[in-house]
């Protein structure tokens, strides 16, 4: 049991968390330089992985497919501990360097604010059950360098806005459990991000430029 997205809202459901596994596997395969056959982004940015490295799976219609186009087989090794999943692709030593670059487009889409009547809550009580997230459009690149050759791939992703949802009491008194409040902070993401997997190591290097969307308070500054 973990959170799933249903009708635009996060709820607990059977099979929840599969996208976390898919996103982690996609990121590992991406930095290994594997061929991307089929991958779709989430319907909203995720807090557990960088925007642009996430992946969605929904049985049986949406899948994640990567192809090992390396000249050697690989082993998928996964570790789970303290609520953290780590996936490694193990194979022969490679001299390739892989860089992920993400740029957030300047125009973002405003999110809706919805009020949902709740007869279990007393009149006048309001509970924020889902914090809104604006809609983003991003361009992402993968640059693979090996010896004197560099190959660049380019994709575009769109994340629709996530509605902000308030549960609004309409009853005479509290007659049920209070809905869980969404305590997540405002969503921020660096407008420019570059992550490089260095050749032959597990070391990653990051270059960040916050831009308009990477610092707290950006939604107010952007009039959202």
Which residues make up each language-model segment?
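Well-ordered beta-sheet/strand-loop patches within structured domains
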Residues: 1-224
